[in-house]
Amino acid sequence: MSSCSRVALVTGANKGIGFAITRDLCRKFSGDVVLTARDEARGRAAVKQLQAEGLSPRFHQLDIDNPQSIRALRDFLRKEYGGLNVLVNNAGIAFRMDDPTPFDVQAEVTLKTNFFATRNVCTELLPIMKPHGRVVNVSSLQGLKALENCSEDLQERFRCDTLTEGDLVDLMKKFVEDTKNEVHEREGWPDSAYGVSKLGVTVLTRILARQLDEKRKADRILLNACCPGWVKTDMARDQGSRTVEEGAETPVYLALLPPDATEPHGQLVRDKVVQTW
């Protein structure tokens, strides 16, 4: 395959919003679309389902919790396409409200995937993003709610325009540590591991966009976070008010921003509208 070929990639794409995003990109993106999933059998079944609809996604295994798996994907993209045009970081987890798992365990597991693993994907794949590339981190307004429920000191730190990636990583580690020591409330944290993980993703988005401006401004890569809304998925126990197709609209809009677009960039977007942070 020619390294001139354009390619879009979606993580956690075998079901739910990720599957709907992949389907829409197959219809609208001019180039190959790679559907990734942790479970190979489920991923290939999802590809077959889209093929039955007349679409032609490719499959590549990806477990975002496994750095080796991320690097294997990076090497595949480099070899097959010479890089990446569109990255949609959709893979993520959430514990159900009534899950009996201790809160500190929920915090560690949720942040491991939703924040740290998503950051690892960005660390490996952002350097191979091609000029005019588009990066979309699927976040949530739960992150904004978590921010509002943080202490004033934490809110100030998360909103600070000079917060570094290292600072953010330290804050996310501190949350996990504080839950283990049962002092997270005293330390100013909210009671939602999912919310804190998505707060981390949104702030990471702001930081990475700033880094792109500093290092690769001429490449005009746009990187944003989005909230798909409360969608009927396994994660929401099918109780959401939106269909997966509706949930995919804003991520796909951000993934397909035209080449001459200069914004949004480093923003949290819902229903195609930038949210106040």
Swiss-Prot record:
Binding site for substrate: 140
Record protein name field: Carbonyl reductase [NADPH] 3
GO terms under biological process: cognition; phylloquinone catabolic process
InterPro entries: CBR1-like, NAD(P)-bd_dom_sf, Sc_DH/Rdtase_CS, SDR_fam
Catalytic residues (positions): 194
Keyword vocabulary terms for this entry: Acetylation, Cytoplasm, NADP, Oxidoreductase, Phosphoprotein
GO cellular component, as recorded: cytosol; nucleoplasm
Localization per Swiss-Prot or TrEMBL: Cytoplasm
Any Pfam family the entry gives: adh_short
GO molecular function list: 3-beta-hydroxysteroid 3-dehydrogenase (NADP+) activity; carbonyl reductase (NADPH) activity; NADPH binding; NADPH dehydrogenase (quinone) activity
EC number: 1.1.1.184, 1.6.5.10
Entry keyword 4Fe-4S: no
Signal peptide start and end residues: none
Annotated positions binding NADP(+): 10-34, 38-42, 63-64, 90, 194-198
